[in-house]
Amino acid sequence: MFNSVLNNEVFVAAITGVEIIAAVTRRSRSSSISGDDAAIVCNQFRHDVQTDYQVIEMTEKIINAGMSLSETQGLRGYDAVQLAAGCAVNELCLISGLPPAIFVSADNELNVAATSEGLAVENPNSYP
């Protein structure tokens, strides 16, 4: 799904770090992954956020859009903020004459909402 040769930019909402670390830690605590593997994943993610990803800071505009998306799409809080950040990146791409952003999520409910907001969506679970 992601081809580094294409030199694509990866944008993540600032809250993504909290979500990733929490999800990996919970899986480790439930023994679905080992503590060592969890530590490796968390450390790699922290490194990637610092070196490879463009972090979208939480602005008043994104928070307000997230609140609206919670109401209109029935999304959970962080999901609504993720979608608001994706919409903001897409808007910047289009204004700048760049191709539209692709919203990447494995959450089917969030993907339906993103599609209804006009975003192109890719689900990583669709790629073996």
Residue ranges with predicted function:
Residues 26-61:
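Helix-adjacent hinge/juxtasegments
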Residues 1-16, 27-40, 125-128:
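Short, well-structured N-terminal submotif of metal-dependent ribonuclease cores
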Residues 13, 89-128:
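Acidic, PIN/NYN-like endoribonuclease modules and their adjacent C-terminal/linker elements
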Residues 20:
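Conserved phosphoryl-transfer catalytic core
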